[in-house]
Amino acid sequence: MPRKKPTPRPVPPLSSSAFEQGWSSPRAARSAPPTVSGRWLLIASSIALVAAAACAWLTLCLLFWQGSWQLLYHPTSAVARTPASAGLPFDPVAFATTEAGVPRLRGWWIPAAPDAHYSRFTVLYLHSRTGNLGDTVDALAALHNLGVNVLAFDYRGYGQSQFAHPSEARWIEDADWALKYLTATRHVPAGAIILDGRDLGANLAIEVAAAHPDLAGVVLESPLESPVNAIFNDPRARLIPAHLLVRDRFNADQAGNPLLIPSLWLVAEPESSKPAFQSPHPAGYDRITAQKMLVWLKPSPAPSQPFADAYTRWLDDLPTRPGTP
């Protein structure tokens, strides 16, 4: 006989009380999405926004720290002129070599005529923050016409010198290398060397002269009062701690305080109705107790006769240093 199929047992219907007691099927429990508190969503979103803003701010600080030098220094690499264009005798020089024998600095040696009146002096010329040596030929010609020897060079990052981002520390190091080249290679006594700086190079000359009291003197052509303001006045500097990120200062007021050698200040007359002698003195001038001379000059694109007259008058008054001819 064929077997009878078992009759399925009827499933009793669920009462509404089961749902009221929180019962649910396993499938329904597995498919139900978890609930997230709106408060936690708000906190997570806030943390993400703060982290993104912090990353953006830190990135801005990093970019400003890496590129702020371009607001103060404006170097160029192509040297358009040489002293030969002004009829000056000169020798290209290279010094401050690396361990591999590669020179870091390049410049020009412009000797004085053998019978020149001030041939016992050698001027180390520190050019401005803009351009390169090719833009200084007229100034170098004016110095040569005075009858002094001249060494001019490009800082690292300028002209044909080694590539590097300019900075106050590197400028000071470059100037020290140039002094060492004069004393060790050219055998020029320190007491016969005059620093001559223009624009930001004048601020550099004050710092270097303060560290080398054995030099003959220093000439400061239009030193800048607050050069680093070119960085701090940038709109981006208001968003970050620029004073902590920028190390350069070139503070002529503070650097001039320990200056112990004679100084000549050649400053352009201010554009005002007051006489020049009633104008405020340049920053750092009043702090200097050593021999000093201040001359106001009318603005001129090239060194003028008053420039030469003031320079020679100052040279005549320089005291003779031990060991100098």
Regions found by a protein language model. Name each.
Residues 53-97:
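An N-terminal hydrophobic leader/cap segment in hydrolases
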Residues 100-183:
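Membrane-embedded segments
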Residues 139, 252, 261, 274-286:
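Short alpha-helix in the alpha/beta-hydrolase fold that links the catalytic acid
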Residues 187-199:
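Alpha/beta-hydrolase fold nucleophile elbow
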Residues 197-207:
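Glycine-rich nucleophile elbow surrounding the catalytic serine of serine-hydrolase chemistry
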Residues 219-229, 248-251:
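Active-site nucleophile loop of the alpha/beta-hydrolase fold
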Residues 258-260, 265-269:
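Short beta-strand/loop motif that positions the catalytic acidic residue
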Residues 282, 287-325:
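C-terminal catalytic histidine-bearing segment of alpha/beta-hydrolase fold enzymes
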